[in-house]
Amino acid sequence: MEKYVSFMTCADFIVSTPDYFRYNPADEFITPEQIEEIAANTKSSLSGTGYAVRKPVYLWMTEDALRQDYARYESAEQLDSHMSRMEHRGDMVMGDTRIEALDNSLFDKLQVFDGDISPMLEPNNNAIAIAVSLDDYGNLPNPEYYPKVGDTITATYADDVKYIDSRTGELRTEDTPEEYFQEKLYGARDVEYTVCALVELPYSMSYRYGGIGYETVLSVDTAQRDSGGAAIPMLYLFDTADDADEAEAEQYLSKLTAGEFSPLMYESKATARSEFAQFRQMFLLIGGILCAIIGLVGLLNFFNAMMTGILSRRREFAVLQAVGMTNRQLKTMLIYEGLFYAMSSVAVAFILSLAVGPLAGKMLGSMFWFFEYQFTVLPVLLTIPVFLLLGLLIPCMMYDNAAKCSVVEQLRDAQ
């Protein structure tokens, strides 16, 4: 469960507005006053704010990298046309970017894939971290897409952006064909950053949507300095020291966000655990039904095999009784035989569990990243008393039914 919870949320509590959690663009999210109120009414061991840079900003990246982004949405012909309209500097192209600024306390939430984030904690730094997309198993599928640690990259901040008609230099109109659209930046200025690290930015504290270009991380002081104070609070997150503080915070936030028109929403590890419990319950229900069906079929087959074995040997049993075997001896023999079949079935089930269990666990682990296989003999142990009981009762019932007839009648029926 904790593997699932840690993936779904990186903190005990994340608070913002409904627009943030519903992926709606907004000019304002959670306010500093709301953050202060929450901080004053909760006990936290770690807390901080994530900021969105609400200003046009672009990052200069290689054309090959930008082509990888657009190739997901455009044909080769459209892509070539698009690239020809974009602003170039040598082999670099001006691409979109998403810059998120973090309080220094939140850098502990980043998973460093390569490099070191400590330069971002220094005052007046020009360090930037590139957020990479790792797969469910922590691997970087396309390392060539990202800049290298130590590279210098240029970001262009602008006060405003307009689309113009590249033929006339005037603002575009409704009649302007798309192939002549061109961005024009007003009040643009460049800032050079040094890539200090490639990091995984947890989804739960990111913008929560993708796009074209790199997603980057700056310290809040650097972002405010370079954007002219355009970094606004986007989310507030905090961890609690113990379960009691977590329960108190959960109760407080549930009251604070109650109501359909509440200006705030929150996510917590408690909600993630509840989601996992429902997900797990679905697997238990479906798996339990399938196991019950398979188990019932297995028991019926076991019952049928034993019953058929006894009925097919009625003549043999009658002959044994005719030559002197007592009813008690015959019944005891059948019981031991039934118990032998029962324990043989359990032994085969145990061997199959040892052989098939790890293979099935590996297969499920490749399908569900949060799945961890753990071998258990409990299901096999639970079948032992059931099979022993069947191995004891079936011979007794079948023999008692046959013993109602004399040996002569049994021989005649067997013929």
Map each language-model feature to its residues.
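Basic-flanked hydrophobic alpha-helices used for secretion and membrane insertion
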Residues: E2-G287
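Hydrophobic, well-ordered secondary-structure elements that form the walls
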Residues: V195, Y236-F238, L253, F276, ...
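Internal alpha-helical transmembrane segments of multipass membrane proteins
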Residues: Q281-A305
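Short, highly charged, low-complexity non-transmembrane loops/tails of multi-pass membrane proteins
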Residues: S6-D12, V408-Q415
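Interfacial "coupling" helices/loops that link adjacent transmembrane helices in transporter permeases
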Residues: G298-Y341
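Short, strongly hydrophobic transmembrane alpha-helices
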Residues: M1-E2, A347
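Short helix-loop junctions at transmembrane helix boundaries
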Residues: R273-F283, Q329-M333, A342-E409
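Hydrophobic alpha-helical transmembrane segments
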Residues: A230-A231, F238-T240, G288-I293, V323-E337
